[in-house]
Amino acid sequence: MSELASQQCEACRADAPKVSEQELSELMHLIPDWQPLVVKGELQLRREFTFRNFKEALAFTNRLGELAEAEFHHPAILTEWGKVTVSWWTHKIGGLHRNDFIMAARTDQLLSDPLHK
């Protein structure tokens, strides 16, 4: 288990601090397949996962949904034939919190499933 994925998410309040530029740089090294991008003025993490077909993409989406429910932290998910696009950010603060990086790392761990190509 990666260092980041083994960390616990914390309850996030509306006044919680967003990650700093330095924290962003440090944390991105731990999830190198994710891209930071600004969407509607909010910094998010995004990654596209590829699969052999829609059934595998949907199975991954469902596993991710279970993970999100367990942590009470939910991503934006777009499921298509052979592809799932996942975006993490913290709605309450309108940007990135450490929890988003933890959840991105945990999302990566779902790839150990043999359904992923």
Curated annotation (Swiss-Prot):
InterPro entries for the chain: PCD_sf, Pterin-4-alpha-carb_dehyd, Pterin_deHydtase
Keyword Lipid metabolism: no
Family matches, as Gene3D superfamilies: Transcriptional coactivator/pterin dehydratase
Keywords for the protein's UniProt record, in alphabetical order: Lyase
Superkingdom of the source species: Bacteria
GO molecular function: 4-alpha-hydroxytetrahydrobiopterin dehydratase activity
Catalysis performed (reactions): (4aS,6R)-4a-hydroxy-L-erythro-5,6,7,8-tetrahydrobiopterin = (6R)-L-erythro-6,7-dihydrobiopterin + H2O
HAMAP family cross-referenced by the UniProt entry: Pterin_4_alpha
NCBIfam families: PRK00823.1-1
Similarity annotation: Belongs to the pterin-4-alpha-carbinolamine dehydratase family.
The protein's name in its UniProt record: Putative pterin-4-alpha-carbinolamine dehydratase
Protein's organism: Aeromonas salmonicida (strain A449)
